[in-house]
């Protein structure tokens, strides 16, 4: 990247655009199909382009009206800022730094993942009270090393990335991916912003970690990259990971948990002003989402089974996306040992004591986009799902062979004691839920700045102002406070909810 006085230029697609830059005020979000404002349109006219050949690279830059001779101009080339070159450099604390302007590489789960700062392949790091910003791709990386796979799908083109990702799980086990040697990191009270791919990323190496009290914003807003690895927090195999009390706003996607989301807890986070808030993909649980504010237009996307959503405030849509073309692993509880594989027929979700706001789903997803017409406010998207284990077993008994009985059969949904405000619609199988008509409103604002490290827990949450207007009839309704023992076991892992 190229910077002038700390301002990051845009990378131009060709040299001609350096001399005739195009000012942009809006950009299309490819996942939702919506167009969103560009944060600072004036900066879109500050651009650079590089030609790289056998000799020295040549860089052209347009600094607009800024004078480079009297300014601080930086070309970032370092792949990381704080990163061990060897594995198993354990128990390191990184505290109190400002770290910025790293030329980090794209970090998919099938590659050697690197970030501006991270432990490489190790255990027990604490990354706290730092400001981490303007990384080309990733801010904090808790991810995979290279011997278990390094972009083989791209280099060899013989098998899909999905297959290589499966292989990487077993390859990592052979080199010591377990609780005793890898993971258990803490990422807390950091101010992470303006990264091109993810604020925090990690495959395998993130297991057993805590990500808490961080302020994360302005992630992937330039839409320089397209891929399945982009979010404020993007984790694969977040086994027994806790994501707590973070404030995540102004990202293309807030939190994305992908593969092997098991024993994971997402609790007391505030997500707002994102194109999408929370996406849980091809996982089998058990995972818990509780006491969060999910206030963006697209609040929840579920392409998984085994979730428990408890006492959340959900201001936008929910979207369901079963996946019968990818079987992914689940594990022995609290372990990296693989217990089995399963597809994602949908269902096996629990929704207890949530508050749903209504709205226009076309504002969350463009009608002509990939997911237009497939999102709902409330739980009505579960309409074709059985509402109990008994209903599910009745359907199983009607078929002759195993394939007919089970393949693609939707799993039961357990929904109770939720509240649907004006415009939100319930699942027919809900128990003890309420629809409350009348005007309502929800807004979230966040004060500028980072987090105050010495303030301790909740430092990020203290930046938030939440305003809610509820109908008068709501005052008579009380949301339950269920215990984890009240939640039905996860189907595939056959495991209890413990978090």
PLM regions with names:
Residues 87, 91-92, 97, 110, ...:
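Solenoid scaffold repeats with emphasis on beta-solenoid/beta-helix
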Residues 1-121, 133, 141, 148-177, ...:
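Extracellular polysaccharide-degrading/modifying enzymes targeting complex plant/algal/animal polysaccharides
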Residues 135-232, 236-242:
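Hydrophobic, small-residue-rich alpha-helical packing segments that form membrane-like cores
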Residues 179-219, 224, 347-365, 404-435, ...:
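Extended amphipathic secondary-structure runs
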Residues 150-168, 216-236, 271-340:
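Long amphipathic alpha-helical scaffold regions
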